[in-house]
């Protein structure tokens, strides 16, 4: 059963990415990248994780509103391509791992710069 859920999650991820690029014309969603999908065991709900390159709180709120508005159309288009009895209800959550990764990169670069300054003294 877990293998099937994993396949469905992968299929939802691929299809939602295509739908966002081709069918959704909301300018608020132009910078959104879908990073992961997790489904409940009965496939009734799918949590869709997305990332943004910006850290602006207003932009983040606009994107969340845009995703909520486009949720019905996304689910409808998913239903046309998925081979499951019932299309899962979509729940959108911000994926902070990308933001965390960029913060770590900045810290590493800062430490390297400090090491280089110490070595030159």
Curated annotation (Swiss-Prot):
Transmembrane segments: none annotated. One of its GO terms (molecular function) is ribosomal small subunit binding. One of its GO terms (cellular component) is cytosol. One of its GO terms (biological process) is maturation of SSU-rRNA. SUPFAM superfamilies: Ribosome-binding factor A, RbfA. Keywords: Cytoplasm, Ribosome biogenesis. Signal peptide: none annotated. NCBIfam families: PRK13818.1 (NF010391), rbfA (TIGR00082). One of several proteins that assist in the late maturation steps of the functional core of the 30S ribosomal subunit. Associates with free 30S ribosomal subunits (but not with 30S subunits that are part of 70S ribosomes or polysomes). Required for efficient processing of 16S rRNA. May interact with the 5'-terminal helix region of 16S rRNA. Belongs to the RbfA family. Monomer. Binds 30S ribosomal subunits, but not 50S ribosomal subunits or 70S ribosomes. This is Ribosome-binding factor A. It comes from Lactobacillus helveticus (strain DPC 4571).
